[in-house]
């Protein structure tokens, strides 16, 4: 049997390369999607938002004592905070950082310098109010919860989310080294504390263990390696701890006796104190947390949401359950068995540690007692008992030491515990340093780098089961980030209240999480785009679809691999990446068909398509990348994360979406199979292939242009006099744009919750757009001339007017009290969308004419008129696709628990639609009209002439474009 046609080596190589690239592309899409669905760095995706208002005292301490908002305001030792606005700015920045570190990336924060609702609260003393209110910040963020995985009722789920929100925001991260009874040796607000010195140690060699280090400046000129421990003990003794549990009593004498937490001698009869220090990372947060647990009413929705540990803590505080026995280790109950803690304010910073644990007492002189037996002796009644302390866990006995014990809850607030001394052999012997202090003051790790004279190192962190383990680098770095962005010095949280903003989303598909359903929506969007591209452009569309899928999946995979959190911000960003890639791919496809309709062959059409789109695509992607890098540099937290995703997407879009598609198509077109028009064209377009006129080529020379290229006149003339009435509209919008910009700069609060979580990020987006736009203007002036530059400038101002107007309009129309939608990020994303459209118009208009600038006014009008008559349909499709994408996304996140709708999803569709209108039409129409009007003034002379060239007959017929009927029809 013979084949009618032999396959050439060229054909085999090209088709083999194509199949290899296609297989690799499909593998990348499938493997990348699988990896994303199994990724551990998945954030909340519209699981229902909560809004929490945190109230702060208007006063600050003048004598370094802590202020308690549940007690009557003292008459001395306090003063008013003078600059509330600046104070709240610091609080805002700290919250933006801490919530981002905790994994809440959809965060919005608003401020109120005098919140009158504080007067309605019953858990703060009214003497603290100033003019009937208190300063406050209101935080809205998404929480990750799946109701399908629990049997709890809706009210229990809601209560759990509210409590989670409270515990997430009632933090005041501040490093503090204290005695067990709350005497502060130093904290991170101390003038001698070197805040910049807090560092997470990078693991060395094969170890994965990290540590936290920081420096302090003792009141001594030089601290040597030999005097290190002695100097630190002298520093402790200088704090006048003679009456502290550190030096006297049985370790917890301050909370024993009548009217106190524990019975007399509950911790033994020793008299040398406990010699224990506690390193807190958030003691104020711990106090708020324990008080909130105490305030929960038994049997309430909040009570029913307690986990095992929280319920154990509640029972301890109320002397109920397993803590109602009257054991002298526990609470000093009265005759009726009631707890000595009558109200939340009875729990203070001074006695908080003793709820967590009972410190083991210190014996000044060692004895011959059985240390191990004594260590297990809960009562420690014999003052001669010596308890061996070799690590931080030995310094205390947990109040509940089992795996579900409540003491483990304190790992969110305590970093470490340090015993400073060990018993000596006999009275008068030199001080013996305990191993925990030796580790805390590692003599081999005293390289001072930040201006202190003593360096501390914490190599073991308190864990959730009450034990101590070495932290990994991520854990240490997280603590470091939280501690280096604290509240302002004067900040004291008064109280907080929270509520659900919208009904939480239920699983939209059985046993599928919200993230998975969102990812399914993402997959369907890519699939629909692939089908439509294939239907429109046949084989070209199929290759483009593969490149599109590989590009967007790679963007998310790489983003996740470098530490990004894949959440609602990521999905919003990647949907814009899809829409922008569609603009570029549609542009390539329509240029190809335009060449075909102009009687060029398939091969020549594709070559011209690449030639005339390469630089425009390169310019746009460079602009995209630079803008993302600028926003990364100028912004913080989730906005910075979004910019990271966009920077990655700029690279993957160019090399995968644009690069892979043109490689695949070029290889196939240049193969023998590329001559088969049925693989590329429908019969309507293929008819143009039979109209090839001759073997002539138009080459640049010195003859003048004619205007007879336009054989037919378009139905719509954008240069009619009536259309110039739009100039009046443009002038009004330009004025509005200036007003909007001034409003943003002067009164950003008018945008309310739709700004970013912190001021720097909002300003970073605006500055980034402005800087990159100015750079692009300077580039355009050199490359395209004055007409293009002025057209872009006016269009850009119109765009800004529209985008800012939409932000204000949206804030007014939807009247959302709080939302996790940050409209300021949409300004950046739609600016990118606009830039992609400008790139498309540039390719469509300028590059099609081989870089030459034209000066014949009639010709220019006809050229721009023809281009815009053809391009508006493509613009409409591209703009509609963005809204369509968000409709699909919303459909897969539709609904809510008990049938209540989450309207945030539908607000999102409307918001995208409004922004889309502001971006798609008037600015682009203005760009074309002004550019066409001004182009005759670009006096760069370039002429054409015909040059006859003899060629063997081929399908390639290089002729200049003649704008014949139907050439630009979509």
Swiss-Prot record:
Write out the transmembrane intervals: 11-31, 515-535, 537-557, 558-578, 614-634, 645-665, 726-746, 762-782, 789-809, 816-836, 877-897, 903-923
Lipid bilayer topology: Multi-pass membrane protein
- Calcium found in the keyword field: no
In residue numbers, the region (Disordered) covers: 366-387
Cell wall biogenesis/degradation is among the record's keywords: no
Q: Where is the composition biased (Low complexity)?
A: 367-387
Q: Which UniProt keywords apply?
A: Cell membrane, Membrane, Transmembrane, Transmembrane helix
Q: Where in the cell is it found?
A: Cell membrane
User: Where mainly found?
Assistant: membrane
A single Gene Ontology CC annotation of this entry is:
plasma membrane
**Superkingdom field:** Bacteria
Would you tell me the protein name for this molecule? Uncharacterized protein MG277
Q: What is the lineage of its organism?
A: Bacteria, Bacillati, Mycoplasmatota, Mycoplasmoidales, Mycoplasmoidaceae
């Amino acid at each position: 049997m013979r084949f009618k046609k032999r396959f050439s080596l060229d054909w085999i190589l090209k088709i083999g390369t194509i199949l290899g690239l296609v297989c690799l592309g499909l593998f990348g899409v499938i493997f990348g999607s699988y990896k994303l669905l199994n990724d551990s760095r998945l954030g909340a995706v519209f699981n229902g938002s909560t809004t929490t208002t945190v109230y702060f005292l208007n006063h600050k301490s003048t004598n370094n004592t802590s202020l308690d908002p549940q007690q009557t305001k003292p008459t001395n030792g306090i003063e008013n905070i003078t600059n509330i606005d600046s104070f709240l700015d610091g609080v805002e920045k700290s919250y933006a950082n801490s919530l981002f570190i905790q994994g809440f990336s959809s965060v919005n924060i608003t401020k109120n310098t005098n919140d009158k609702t504080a007067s309605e609260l019953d858990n703060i003393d009214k003497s603290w109010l100033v003019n009937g209110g208190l300063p406050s910040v209101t935080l809205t963020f998404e929480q990750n919860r799946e109701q399908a995985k629990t049997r709890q009722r809706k009210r229990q789920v809601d209560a759990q989310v509210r409590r989670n929100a409270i515990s997430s925001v009632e933090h005041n991260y501040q490093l503090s080294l204290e005695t067990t009874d709350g005497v502060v040796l130093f904290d991170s607000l101390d003038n001698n504390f070197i805040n910049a010195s807090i560092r997470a140690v990078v693991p060395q060699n094969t170890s994965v263990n990290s540590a936290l280090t920081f420096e302090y400046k003792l009141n001594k000129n030089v601290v040597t390696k030999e005097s290190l421990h002695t100097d630190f003990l002298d520093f402790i003794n200088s704090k006048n701890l003679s009456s502290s549990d550190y030096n006297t009593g049985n370790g917890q004498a301050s909370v024993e006796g009548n009217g106190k937490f524990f019975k007399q001698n509950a911790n033994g009869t020793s008299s040398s104190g406990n010699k224990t220090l506690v390193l807190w990372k958030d003691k104020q947060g711990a106090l708020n947390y324990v008080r909130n647990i105490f305030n929960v009413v038994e049997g309430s929705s909040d009570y029913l949401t307690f986990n095992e540990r929280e319920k154990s803590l509640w029972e301890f505080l109320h002397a109920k359950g397993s803590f109602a026995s009257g054991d002298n280790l526990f609470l000093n109950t009265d005759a009726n068995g009631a707890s000595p803690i009558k109200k939340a304010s009875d729990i203070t910073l001074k006695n908080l540690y003793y709820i967590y644990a009972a410190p083991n007492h210190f014996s000044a002189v060692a004895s011959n007692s059985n240390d191990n037996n004594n260590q297990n002796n809960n009562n420690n009644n014999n003052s001669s008992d010596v308890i061996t302390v070799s690590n931080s866990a030995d310094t205390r006995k947990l109040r509940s030491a089992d795996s579900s014990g409540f003491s483990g809850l304190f790992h969110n607030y305590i970093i470490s515990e340090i015993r400073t001394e060990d018993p000596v052999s006999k009275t008068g012997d030199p001080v013996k340093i305990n191993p925990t202090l030796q580790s805390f003051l590692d003599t081999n790790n005293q390289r001072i780098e930040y201006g202190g004279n003593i360096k501390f190192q914490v190599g073991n962190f308190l864990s959730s089961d009450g034990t101590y383990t070495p932290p990994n680098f991520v854990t240490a770095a997280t603590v470091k980030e939280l501690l280096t962005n604290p509240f302002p010095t004067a900040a004291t949280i008064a109280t907080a209240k929270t509520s659900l903003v919208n009904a939480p989303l239920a699983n939209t598909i059985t046993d599928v999480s919200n993230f998975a359903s969102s990812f399914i929506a993402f997959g369907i969007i890519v699939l629909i785009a692939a089908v439509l591209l294939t239907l429109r452009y046949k084989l070209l569309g199929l290759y483009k679809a593969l490149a599109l899928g590989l590009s967007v999946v790679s963007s998310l995979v790489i983003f996740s691999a470098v530490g990004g959190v894949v959440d609602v911000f990521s999905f919003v960003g990647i949907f814009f990446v899809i829409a922008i890639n569609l603009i570029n791919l549609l542009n390539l496809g329509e240029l190809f068909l335009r060449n075909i309709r102009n009687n060029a062959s398939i091969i020549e059409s594709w070559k011209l398509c690449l030639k005339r789109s390469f630089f425009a695509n390169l310019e746009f992607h460079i602009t995209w990348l630079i803008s993302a890098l600028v926003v990364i540099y100028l912004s913080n937290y989730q906005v910075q994360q979004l910019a990271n995703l966009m920077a990655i997407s700029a690279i993957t879009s160019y090399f995968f979406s644009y690069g892979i598609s043109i490689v695949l198509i070029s290889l196939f077109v240049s193969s023998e199979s590329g001559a088969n028009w049925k693989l590329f064209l429908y019969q309507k377009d293929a008819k143009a292939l039979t109209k090839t006129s001759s073997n002539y080529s138009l080459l640049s020379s010195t003859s003048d242009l004619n205007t007879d290229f336009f054989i037919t006149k378009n139905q719509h003339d954008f240069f009619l006099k009536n259309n110039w009435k739009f100039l009046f509209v443009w002038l009004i919008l330009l004025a509005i744009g200036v007003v909007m910009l001034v409003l943003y700069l002067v009164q950003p609060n008018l945008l309310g919750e739709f700004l970013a979580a912190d001021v720097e990020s909002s300003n970073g987006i605006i500055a980034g757009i402005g800087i990159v736009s100015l750079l692009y203007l300077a580039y355009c002036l050199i490359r395209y001339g004055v007409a293009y530059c002025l057209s872009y400038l006016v269009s850009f101002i119109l765009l800004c007017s529209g985008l800012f107007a939409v932000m204000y309009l949206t804030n007014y129309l939807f009247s959302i009290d709080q939302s996790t939608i940050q409209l300021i990020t949409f300004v950046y994303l739609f600016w990118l969308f606009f830039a992609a459209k400008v790139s498309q118009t540039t390719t469509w208009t300028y590059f099609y004419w081989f870089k030459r600038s034209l000066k014949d006014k009639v010709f220019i009008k006809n050229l721009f008129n023809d281009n815009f008559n053809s391009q508006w349909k493509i613009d409409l499709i591209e703009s509609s696709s963005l809204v369509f994408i968000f409709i699909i996304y919303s459909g897969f996140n539709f609904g809510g628990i008990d049938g209540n709708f989450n309207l945030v999803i539908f607000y999102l569709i409307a918001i995208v639609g409004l922004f889309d209108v502001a971006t798609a039409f008037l600015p682009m129409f203005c760009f074309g009209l002004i550019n066409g009007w001004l182009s005759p003034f670009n006096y760069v002379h370039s002429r054409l002439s015909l040059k006859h060239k003899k060629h063997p007959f081929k399908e390639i017929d290089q002729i200049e474009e003649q704008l014949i009927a139907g050439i630009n029809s979509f």
